[in-house]
């Protein structure tokens, strides 16, 4: 769990800036400007849910990520098949009640372990052992909180029950994407987070935007995959969730 930080010398720092600007500190009466032009809200404004799915599919091709479409009833088989295609376990998952809600709990806790596929569920009390398990894992599996159709990006919230290592350190990565999580682009994702803050929801201090497998390029534009994360990634789109 991340330690709570403290802010020191904030007042003196801000006072010094105001003094350098030749004015008094403004502590009230400051509001966000109303921008005359906000083209970000017009981009993809007329897209339907199905249009966004098509956009997501098309961009998955560009980022070398396979997208599998299914429904809630077919998710079990789709996930099992994809893990087999990634050559099995070990598997690591966050502590997330959606695995049970989506009918995957038996697969995680009984069937895969009985078949010799270890499954590690993130356990905050185990500390650094979670990172060791993530390093040893062949497949990391998470749910996408928000999905950006324009860039085929999944958004993950890190927490004490879902460390960043789950999607970063395994050799391969699978994101389960509820169709209802798809939005056009970063604009809408930012609005969702801002609304959560206005509603008093505690927003995670670590929010990760993941676009397919790890891709890097050197100065000669030679693509190298897997240097900073998984070598392969797949998205499983659940059409009725």
From Swiss-Prot:
GO terms for biological process: lactate metabolic process. HAMAP family: LutC (MF_02104). The lineage of its organism: Bacteria, Bacillati, Bacillota, Bacilli, Bacillales. Gene3D superfamilies: NagB/RpiA/CoA transferase-like (3.40.50.10420). Pfam families: LUD_dom. SUPFAM superfamilies: NagB/RpiA/CoA transferase-like. It comes from Bacillus velezensis (strain DSM 23117 / BGSC 10A6 / LMG 26770 / FZB42) (Bacillus amyloliquefaciens subsp. plantarum). The gene is lutC. Is involved in L-lactate degradation and allows cells to grow with lactate as the sole carbon source. It comes from the Bacteria. Belongs to the LutC/YkgG family. InterPro entries: FTHF_cligase-like_sf (IPR024185), LUD_dom (IPR003741), LutC (IPR022823), NagB/RpiA_transferase-like (IPR037171). This is Lactate utilization protein C.
